[in-house]
Amino acid sequence: MAATRSRAKAREAYDPSFFEKLAAAEDRHFWFRARNRVIGTLAAQLTAGLPAGFRVLEVGCGTGAVLRALERACPRGTVVGMDFFGEGLRHAHRRGSRLVQADLHAPPFAVGFDLVGLFDVVEHLPDDVRVLSDLARLLAPGGALLVTVPAGRELWSWYDEAVRHRRRYEPTELAARLGEAGYAVEYLSPYMSPIFPLVWLRRKLARAGRPPSDAESHALAEGEFRVVPGLNELLDWCLAPEVRRIARRRTLPFGTSIVAVARRR
């Protein structure tokens, strides 16, 4: 009965039927490729001075696409993925990753991690401060949290509702949530800046039209994962230079997403 309730709550936060489309798109789609470059670059920096055997955990690893980027960025460490949904973990298992199926509020780990990643997960959950606070307990002394979230309330649309987002964040809002959860923010910046005008226009037009039904929203959201030849490569090329500024810890002026590095106070 408790397991059934936990799964029902998890489904309120995320629709596991999306995993199939994600698994087919993540390695090629420009958005996921750009996000993985940012995550991989920062993960490599954050673990560069650690002795071999350091531990990295991705919470909400889904199909394992980001795990692969973390494994490439942290070749001297042990990278583990954790997710509640078996539907996503089945895809991650095919990649040969180290995996654990567990609830993020009850992680089965007796050791701390030098880096914990939470990538576009916390916006799905009702109590973001509680989640961030719980994850702080998984960090080894001096360990870092690396987190990404969707940015900008002005970009809210049917897409957010279809994928069960509860919020999009402003940079100051994410910094405040991290502070409430007991972290000191080391770096925080919007990213995906080059595509912001395109996304803003699409969302504005979507809000101006007839609200789609739930079924239409789901189909439209799945369409966001479609890889369009030519356009996909162009947008990937446009986003590629951004990672160099993030590697230098520059703060970008705007974007459709936010990345943050924080450490437990």
Model features per residue range: what roles?
Residues Y183-S193:
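Conserved S-adenosyl-L-methionine
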Residues M1-F119, V129-L132, F225, P229-G230, ...:
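Conserved N-terminal segment of class I S-adenosyl-L-methionine
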Residues L198-L239:
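C-terminal helical/coil "lid" or tail adjacent to the Rossmann-like core of SAM-dependent
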Residues V129-A144:
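A short glycine-rich, Lys/Arg-flanked "PGG" loop and its adjoining helix->strand segment in the class I
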Residues K204-A206, P253-R265:
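Core SAM-dependent methyltransferase catalytic element
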Residues F119-V122, T148:
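Residues lining the SAM
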Residues A23-A24, L145-R167, P171-R177:
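Short, glycine-/aromatic-enriched active-site segment of Class I SAM-dependent methyltransferases
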